[in-house]
């Protein structure tokens, strides 16, 4: 797992260590292919109470709800602030969504900030 924190928006700079711990915990649960930051932090219009929206691309994310719960269990020891919204998806499913022109995932890929890649 490679962290790309040079891409981290200024609004999340104080959370750099927390994010690194979160990504490491997630990677232990299920090896990460990529993590995209999307939403207000990626757009640059986050408020102090904004959550951190993450699209998590992982091979084991076939069952989205179970994957999100698994990632949350891995993150339990990490402080609850900021709040996270997790959208797990497999690489194959993400490719299908992209090909189908899915608006949500097209926006994540176009406007999102890549924070994690495979080594």
Label the model's feature ranges:
Residues 1-34, 43-48, 58-119:
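Catalytic core of pol beta-like nucleotidyltransferases
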Residues 38-40:
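Glycine-rich beta-strand-to-loop/alpha-helix junction loops that act as flexible
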Residues 53-57:
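Short beta-strand->loop micro-motif that forms the acidic, two-metal-ion catalytic signature
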């Amino acid at each position: 797992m490679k962290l790309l924190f040079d891409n981290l928006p200024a609004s999340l700079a104080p959370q750099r260590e927390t994010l690194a711990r979160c990504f490491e915990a997630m990677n232990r649960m299920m090896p990460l292919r990529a993590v995209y930051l999307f939403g207000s932090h990626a757009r640059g219009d986050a408020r102090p109470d904004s959550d951190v929206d993450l699209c998590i691309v992982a091979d084991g994310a076939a069952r989205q709800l179970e994957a999100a719960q698994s990632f949350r269990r891995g993150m339990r020891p990490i402080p609850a602030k900021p709040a996270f919204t997790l959208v797990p998806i497999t690489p194959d499913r993400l490719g299908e969504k992209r090909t189908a022109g899915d608006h949500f995932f097209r926006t994540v890929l176009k406007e999102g900030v890549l924070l994690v890649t495979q080594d």
